Amino acid sequence: MKFDRFSSPLGQPYVAEIEDVPLYHYLPGDSVLVLEVPGCPLRCPYCDRPLLARSQDWSPYDPARLAAAVESLGSQPGFAGVAWSGGEPSLHWDNVVECSRKVHQAGKKVVLATNGGVTAELLRDSPETVDALLVRFKGFSDETYRTLGSPAGLLENSRALVERAIDAGIHVELMLDIARDTPAQGQEFSAMLAWIAQDLRRGIPLHLRAIAPEHGFAIHHGPVTPFLENLVESGRRQHVGFVYLSNCHGHFFNNTMCPNCYSVIVDRTTRPLDLSFVTDGICGNCGTDVGLTLDKETP
């Protein structure tokens, strides 16, 4: 299906796995229509979408035409709804809210990835806009954010957004950029784990995105170092039950393991996903609630 009748000059929307957002604990195995928007408050030297981040060549999505596309795709098994990404969706919030309302009227879900520009206040004023949220952290210190040209308070805004979303019953997952083998990044990772353990809840998914600033892009298929593997192991062991290397495709650390019995309950090294080891979010081996929201139509 072509979507050019409602897309922006940036490019057409496209259908992707919800794992590509990435969201691993919300409707795993389902697909979403990805809506990209331009602009970003940060200036990351390793940005893998610099044209999108800087582009001003954009026009709002047409809500009625988007709704028609969603209704057409809705007949496909496992189609969940739309995913706002980019870019920073908060820069076009009125369009996001208007379009998301149409998607919900069509009986589908809305997920959104943000660098922290979506504030707790925006979420409070538009409580039914988003069903699931990925909050992307570029580090976990004000110093790191300053080096990326961040507006003042963006890290604190991101933390407040996560807490507000959880309180509102929105599904939340987190992402942290990791410059590989950098001790300072390891320290920020530990600080983020402590925040999750103290102020949030054990079991919230945390995605590590491996980056290589010297190459100027995020690593999608590069080798995984012992440093990264140690971070995942320590996170799973100490504070957070679910830590993933989400952009290192095919790695064992993309799998969802039960934090109690350590069984692999979602294997992401193969397609389609095998969800036979989890029922209603419960580990099929030991009965532990692993916090997965499953598509009720999933066989």
Describe every region a protein language model picked out.
Residues 1-6, 49-59, 265-272, 290-297:
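Iron-sulfur (Fe-S) cluster-binding segments and ferredoxin-like electron-carrier domains
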Residues 2-132:
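Conserved Radical SAM active-site core
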Residues 33, 82, 110-112, 133-135, ...:
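Hydrophobic faces of well-ordered beta-strands that scaffold small-molecule active sites
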Residues 51-56, 147-152, 220-221:
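Short glycine-enriched, charge-decorated loop/helix-capping segments at active-site entrances
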Residues 74-102, 144-160, 166, 176-192, ...:
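Conserved glycine-rich "GG(E/T)P / GGGxP" loop and the immediately following alpha-helix
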Residues 78-80, 106-108, 129-131, 168-172, ...:
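Short, well-ordered coil/turn segments that N-cap beta-strands
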Residues 89-91, 117-123, 132-151, 171-183, ...:
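Conserved radical SAM core fold
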Residues 167, 180-299:
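Auxiliary Fe-S-binding modules of radical SAM enzymes
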